[in-house]
């Protein structure tokens, strides 16, 4: 769940023709050497609600336990939404390593491979829904693009080019079912963020709220976004619950917009 500025930047790149958009049946050069380099010294892996749900399936922990142990929460600087960044383990040599990185026979592997975060699963592909600059309908349906990388960071890209190793997009991103779930999740979340922006971006409403009110609102949103899915067992159950929670979140934001004193009710619920 990247912040708004990054998505706007991608939309601008798309409009300028600077992104290499790939269709499901297209191929791209890549070979994973299992070097573990992309799983170290990172601070940019954002966990969205679907990622956190999948990590509960992989670890057997509750949503809150996953966030507390494997996440770092912060407020999106432009979205004003609670975001969760993947936490890394500090090593004796000063490096940081993903908690889910394992090693076997000299090769690194992901301990939660079947449920790894979407950003990790699709690398070196990125995902974009290019929105119009005026916030209107998307210019592009959810699509994958090849991230620019010259091979200095990932040796697998160099090897794939030299040995002509290709991957099909739809297979690499987890198949049609994974793509279906991801797209539905994205549609639900996009509808919510559009509404949230209308509630609070106009006239800088969020910035004009006092710090306590901001904290209460963000706390309530964080619970709705990330923590209400412990009894979900399948992707479709998660999607149904997520849609319901985002409708509740929109209603809550509308109440806060219409009646600032509604924050007091939220504080009482939280207490």
Feature map (PLM): residue ranges:
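Short loop/turn segments that flank or connect secondary-structure elements
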Residues: 1-271
């Amino acid at each position: 769940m990247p912040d708004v500025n990054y998505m706007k930047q991608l939309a601008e790149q798309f409009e300028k023709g600077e992104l290499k958009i790939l269709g499901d049946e297209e191929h791209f050069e890549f070979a994973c050497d299992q070097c573990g380099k992309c799983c170290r010294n990172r601070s940019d892996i954002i966990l969205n609600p679907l990622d956190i749900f999948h990590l509960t399936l992989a670890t057997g922990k509750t949503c809150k336990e996953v966030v507390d142990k494997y996440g770092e929460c912060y407020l999106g600087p432009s979205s004003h939404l609670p975001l969760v960044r993947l936490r890394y383990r500090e090593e004796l040599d000063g490096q940081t390593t993903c908690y889910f990185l394992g090693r076997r026979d000299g090769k690194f592997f992901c301990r939660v491979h079947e449920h790894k975060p979407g950003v990790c699963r699709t690398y070196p592909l990125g995902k974009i829904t290019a929105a119009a600059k005026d916030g209107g309908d998307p210019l592009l349906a959810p699509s994958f693009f090849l991230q620019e990388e010259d091979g200095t960071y990932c040796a697998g890209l160099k090897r794939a080019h030299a040995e002509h190793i290709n991957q099909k997009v739809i297979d690499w991103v987890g198949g049609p079912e994974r793509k279906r779930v991801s797209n539905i999740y994205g549609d639900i979340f996009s509808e919510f963020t559009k509404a949230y922006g209308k509630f609070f971006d106009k006239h800088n409403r969020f910035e004009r709220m006092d710090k306590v009110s901001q904290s209460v609102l963000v706390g309530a949103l964080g619970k709705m976004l990330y923590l209400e899915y412990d009894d979900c067992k399948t992707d479709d159950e998660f999607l149904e619950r997520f849609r319901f929670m985002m409708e509740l979140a929109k209603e809550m934001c509308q109440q806060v917009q219409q009646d600032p004193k509604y924050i007091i009710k939220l504080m009482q619920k939280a207490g």
